A protein has these predicted regions:
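Short, solvent-exposed loop/turn segments that connect beta-strands within catalytic domains
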Residues: 58-63, 298-303, 528
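Conserved catalytic motifs of the protein kinase core domain
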Residues: 161, 302-305, 460
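Sec/Tat signal peptide C-region and signal peptidase I cleavage site
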Residues: 15-19
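Phosphate-handling architecture centered on phosphoinositide signaling
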Residues: 20-274, 327, 379, 403, ...
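Middle-to-C-terminal accessory/interaction subdomains
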Residues: 27-29, 38-41, 46, 80-82, ...
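Sec-dependent N-terminal signal peptides
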Residues: 4-13
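C-terminal outer-membrane/trafficking sorting elements
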Residues: 5, 455-464, 468-539
Length: 539
């Protein structure tokens, strides 16, 4: 197999076929696939050989270099739905043993697994709309797909700039929840784990179920797959989601006092982060396609969670229909803008905004994110850094695929240069963020705190897990061994927890104990002076 791959390189250097690019080296890793005279199709994986050249950050990678990151067999197929119309294809592949068995391997520094994607951006001429979403969300929630930019060669043909990307699935290093097996048919074992998604069914009707409240909302089984999940398991997760819908559309949907409201079923923190990212990107397919949800076992806090984010190539002003290009307005109202579409966002997104605690938490989370992760300066710096890294490879990509200055379904903006595409992305993000600053519902009163008289008294507190549903641990190490006070305030500045704790190195557990779900502020104090503070989310 190594010889076959080396032969592919030799043929590529001396005969580029129909490629417009003579490709010899790159600052990005190089992925080389040999199909052995087969055709990659979308209905079944074919067995091919693959090698990866990656000499490390700051080092150049040459087509004549040995495969030093991976060399072996894969099963590969074309992936995507509407994206299959584009000449630059994306691929799903599985790393395998010579016997054809799935083989977990680490690729380009990402944790070992066997399910991968080679994503080739086409209508997204910035080459980074998916990637910026995954990058930002990785700092917000437990898991977001990892990726590494690379350049792809198939059978001697230069294919362009790609992202080698993790496929969403249940795994310790991906969506880290329990994995169902055939014995998990009752009790706690039946309650998780599940990954489902709201999407367009691509197979038979058995692959999905329809919301009893909206015929245009389809839920698909993702992991376990539709052909793996057992009837009892499929019925359980369907009943759970329906119970959530029954509650959220019911008359007492908030019911924070009685504990019977929607918070009984969902991790509100993940719903908030999902909502903010969907609205920030204003993805034209937002909420109604490629929208993942997952649930762990009840014994592990198994409420329904939203995420990870997926499929943002037609986001951030990159679609010319249904007002997706407009930096004003809400994407969750898609059905009122384009009522004729066969799919629509679940109405629960609008319903949740009728809960004042939820909108308080939403506003506070947004304000916090805009100070760091989602600040315009932070996002612009990331975009500029990626554009710089891709400066060389994007030229080859757009030589092979000469679409700069050309309309591709469904571009709203058509830049004549790569830099114009990058600048438009930055402008759109800034404009959209500022509109959300002014129009996001909810209020977030700030708690006034004293500034430490001696700045050297400040310390760092680690809170985990955060958000939490039963208890959280506050860990810190302060040089002064005197007694400290931990105070937790609600959004109106009212004390809900006050606990005296020892100084020095300390780990203190705070239990929920009837405190309502929502966002709170904690302050670690010494003699009345705040030496550390932060935000806390209780589910």
């Amino acid at each position: 197999m190594q010889k076959l791959l080396l032969l592919t390189i030799f043929l590529f250097i001396f005969k580029t076929g129909t490629s417009q690019v003579t490709f010899t080296d790159s600052n990005l890793p190089i992925v080389v696939i040999t199909t052995n005279s087969q055709t990659i199709i979308d209905s079944a994986k074919i067995t091919c050989d693959m090698g990866i050249i990656s000499n490390g950050i700051g080092m150049r990678n040459y087509m004549t270099d040995p495969f030093n990151n991976f060399v072996g067999q894969i099963g590969i197929e074309i992936r995507g739905s509407t994206s299959q119309q584009y000449p630059k294809k994306s691929y799903g592949f599985e790393t395998r043993t010579p016997a054809g068995i799935a083989l977990d391997v680490p690729l380009l520094g990402m944790p070992a697994e066997n399910d991968w994607i080679l994503y080739g951006a086409y209508p997204d001429k910035s080459l980074m709309r998916n990637e910026i979403t995954y990058h930002l969300f990785s700092s917000m929630d437990p898991y977001s797909p990892r990726y590494v930019y690379c350049e792809l060669v198939i059978d001697g043909q230069y294919m362009g700039v790609y992202s080698l990307l993790e496929r969403v699935k249940i795994d310790h290093n991906r969506v880290n929840i329990a994995k169902l097996d055939s014995n998990d048919l009752a009790g706690d074992s039946l309650t998780g784990g599940y990954i489902i998604k709201i999407d367009k069914p691509t197979g038979s009707s058995s692959t999905s179920w329809t919301s009893p409240y909206q015929v245009k909302v389809k839920f698909l089984f993702h992991d376990p797959k539709d052909y793996e999940i057992l009837p009892q398991q499929a019925q359980y997760i369907q009943d759970y989601v329906t119970a959530f819908e029954d509650t959220v559309y019911g008359p007492n949907f908030s019911d924070t006092a009685g504990g019977g409201g929607f918070r009984r079923y969902i991790n509100t923190g993940t719903f908030i982060d999902f909502f903010l990212m969907e609205e920030l990107g204003r993805t034209v397919d937002g909420y109604r396609s490629s929208s993942f949800m997952y649930k762990d076992k009840d014994s592990k806090g198994g409420k329904l969670s939203c995420g990870p984010m997926w499929d943002f190539n037609l986001s951030y002003g990159n679609a010319d229909y249904c007002l997706a290009y407009d930096t004003t307005g809400w994407q969750y109202n898609f059905a009122t803008v384009c009522p004729s579409f066969t799919s629509e966002p679940p109405h629960w997104w609008a319903r949740l905004l009728q809960d004042t605690i939820y909108t308080h938490d939403l506003k506070c989370r947004w304000n916090d994110l805009r100070q760091n992760i989602l600040s315009t300066n932070n996002v612009n710096a990331w975009i500029d850094s990626v554009a710089l890294r891709l400066n060389e490879s994007q030229q080859r990509n757009f030589t092979e695929w000469p679409i700069l200055g050309v309309y591709v379904n469904w571009n709203w903006f058509v830049g004549n240069t790569y830099q114009e595409e990058v600048d438009y992305l930055k402008w759109w993000f800034k404009s959209r963020s500022e509109w959300m600053d002014a129009n996001l519902p909810g209020t977030c009163p700030m708690v006034t705190v004293a500034v430490p008289e001696n700045e050297t008294e400040k310390t760092t507190v680690l809170v985990y897990p955060n958000p939490f549903s039963t208890a959280a641990t506050f860990s810190f190490n302060h040089a002064d061994n005197s007694e400290k006070t931990l105070v937790i305030y609600d959004l109106l500045g009212k004390e809900v927890v006050l606990k005296n704790i020892a100084g020095g190195e300390n780990k203190t557990v705070i239990e929920k104990n009837g405190v309502n779900a929502g966002m709170y502020f904690y302050h670690l104090k010494k003699k009345g002076r705040t030496i550390a503070s932060g935000k806390l989310v209780i589910e």
